[in-house]
Every structure is written in C-alpha cells, then in structure tokens.
C-alpha cells in the first residue's frame, strides 16, 4: 500500500480533481508556498505547497479532508498562482 500524502485541492470537475503536492520540505522555487498557518490547517508539521507540481486525480482516491487554508495562506496561494504558475489548459 502506498503512503497517504496531503494535497491541496485546486479544482474539482465531475469525477476528477486537480491538486498540488504538499511536502514538509522547505520552499525551493518562487512557485512554492510555505504555509504560515500549517497547524490550524490540519497539518502535523510545517509544510510547503508545490504549486508547480500539479496532478489530476480521480475523486475516489481522496480519503478525507484534513483542513482548510487560512485566509492569509489562501491569498498568498492565489498571488503565487497568478504571478508564478499561470498554467495553460
């Protein structure tokens, strides 16, 4: 069995979700978001969202909601998304 890992859900579309990887590693690129409020967001250790590491998953593989981004972290995520990531679909 594979290890369960936290993710940030960015988009939900029918049976699929677009997610960003969450890691305990330090930020290493401008597209990485260190979560200032990681503890109140349901994470056990200081964490970084890698907005440059996106994946598309089936909703059926999601296990449970750990938490929700704080307003401040959500604003910072949106800023990084629009200024650094700018995906083309």
Question: What do these predicted ranges mean?
Answer:
Residues 40-89:
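C-terminal terminal-subdomain/extension
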Residues 1-4, 8-39:
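Compact nucleic-acid interaction/catalytic patches
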């Amino acid at each position: 069995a594979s290890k369960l890992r936290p993710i940030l859900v960015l988009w939900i579309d029918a049976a699929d979700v677009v997610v960003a990887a969450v890691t305990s590693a330090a930020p290493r690129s401008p597209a990485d978001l260190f979560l200032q409020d990681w503890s109140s967001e349901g994470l056990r250790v200081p964490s970084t969202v890698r907005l440059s590491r996106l994946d598309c998953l089936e909703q059926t593989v999601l296990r449970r909601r750990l938490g929700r981004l704080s307003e401040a972290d959500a604003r910072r995520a949106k800023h990084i998304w629009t200024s650094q990531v700018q995906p083309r679909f």
